Amino acid sequence: MLFIILLSLCIYAPLAHWTWHPDGFLRKLGVLDFAGGTVVHMSAGFAALAGAVFLGKRNTHRNGHASSPANIPFVVLGTGLLWFGWFGFNAGSALGANGLATSAFATTNFALAAAMLSGVFWDAFNGRKISALGACIGAVVGLVAITPAAGFVTIGQSLFIGFASAIVCNLVVYVFNNKTAIDDTLDVFPCHGVGRMCGMIFTGIFANGVGFFYGQTTTSTPSRTWLNSFLI
């Protein structure tokens, strides 16, 4: 309970002010975050990393035996609930029933679908049996990655964001599980922390009107690519 209170007051609240308040210094710099990629997922991802480092490995991992998921149907059910709820999370950030909300709704769905397929392909590429767990991890990464970009990109761009972000995050999951002593039980940092990094970079690249590829930049208006990357 104390951790939740401290995280909300000391981490989430300052990030929300910096990013969304008209006087926030990140907002003034031009950083783009449509629905909380930085505010929500960066804070959660890095808090999870800090917790995993502080608490250390579980006993099963100390003995060299990684535990398998307890209940795959519940994983699938939870992913489905996240999928449905994320529509309100992203589309609701348009603050109205309008075209922007519709666009955010669509890009969210397509990014998730692309990331889910990417997770399936990752299993196949590595010679593993295609699993529901891999698809669900990919789906969550797609949702995280599209969160900062949902209202700023097209459907085609959202497909790329979801697919590419899932590949990057699966690489990080592999490194964490096989090359480090960090026991991130639910892969929160790779999915939310790294997924957010990918999403913010792609937002800076693809954002309609102001992105690196599609926007007009001047010496007085730096590219959003670098502004969004600043947070990494």
Where are these regions (language model features)?
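Glycine- and aromatic-enriched membrane alpha-helices
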Residues: 1-232
